Amino acid sequence: MINGAHIIVYSKDAEADKAFIKNVLKFKYVDVHEGWLIFKLPPSEVAVHPSDDNDRHDFYLMTDDLDAEMAGLKRAGAVCEDVSQQAWGRVTRIKLPGGGTLGLYEPRHERP
């Protein structure tokens, strides 16, 4: 029986991104070996979208109030892209210190 999911975020500055997830997003974590942090995620869901690119996967965090979440992130020093309106929700991307981005959205769809 599958009982969870493990997501890997690749980074050009893993230490900075780990500090961001720990200190700005405030995710709980365990140090499994010499600074290798594994973060606890909120409940999750998986969606399958049609695409010609079979090896692409996106990772989004979800919130019930995108404006409030973005305001809190900005107060903590995070930079968020402009919000876009999609059929499935309001979407932004959080800029990570290592140069990558992390999706964040307020869903319009029913959640399982």
Positions of PLM-derived features:
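N-terminal beta-strand motif that seeds the catalytic metal site of vicinal oxygen chelate
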Residues: 1-18, 45, 57-59, 108-112
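Vicinal oxygen chelate
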Residues: 4-12, 40, 51-112
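Conserved active-site tyrosine of GNAT-family acetyltransferases
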Residues: 17-22, 73, 99
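Short secondary-structure junctions
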Residues: 25-32, 78-83
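Conserved short beta-strand elements that form part of the metal-binding/catalytic scaffold
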Residues: 27-57, 61, 101-108
